[in-house]
Amino acid sequence: MQNRIDNLVKWIRTQVPEGGKAVLGISGGKDSTIAAALCVRALGKENVIGVLMPDGIQADIDDSFRVCSLLGIDYHIVNIGNVCYALTQEVDTNFLNRWEFKSAHDNPMIKTNLPARIRMTTLYAVAAMYPNSRVVNTCNASEDYVGYSTKYGDAAGDFSPLGDLTVREILTIGDALGLPHYLVHKTPSDGMCGKTDEDNLGFTYEQLDDFIEGQYDKVPDDVFAKIVTLHKATRHKYRPIPTYERWRDNI
């Protein structure tokens, strides 16, 4: 594991230009905590900037503060609540007289994905304040496999240190880094509906990681089917945007 950590640290150093900083959202969850810790090892705490982005009130924001304090990194707090509400309201206004549409405020796709996209926009705005800086993607391979992220939201970024690692592997890294157990093993949730990520997915990360690792005998049939279905339905999130190619003119 130490070899992997050393390689991650070396790789991160190649992703941020000299004099630049790594900018990442600090949610207080395992992924952002571990990604931030790796960036600190690679670049020094003075070159890592945390951004706390509550949507109105964030119940566990104290964990975000603890991460920044633990790592000794500078941070900014940008509350996205008013922006999310204002944009949703503007969209809603365009559909007030269209009876076939529900209110934008009640649209689950908007409620789930808009805050994630506003957060990524915020990260790039903060990064723009620091010359030559890069935004860190904090998604992991397990969530990516079943599309448990927002396209152009938390799925975006300039480089992804955890993107090829499963949750199981990331937890091992967090423990090896000596990070507090309650941060590394904190039950992940979306912070909106009160449910855990595993509740939303309908299976555990243990089962998902067993599937990804090819240990199919450990995965119940119904869970196997859910994972396959989600993977097929969300592949568009991780493929390059389809582009019309001029050679088709000659078909």
PLM region spans:
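Short, surface-exposed alpha-helical segments at coil->helix boundaries
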Residues: 33-36, 61-65
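ATP/NTP-dependent adenylation/nucleotidyl-transfer catalytic domains that generate, transfer
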Residues: 4-24, 38-41, 46-49, 56, ...
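Conserved G/P- and acidic residue-centered "switch" motifs that form tight phosphate/ATP-binding loops
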Residues: 29
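Alpha-helix N-cap/helix-start motif
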Residues: 60-61, 145
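Active-site glycine-rich loop that binds ribose-phosphate moieties when present
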Residues: 116-119
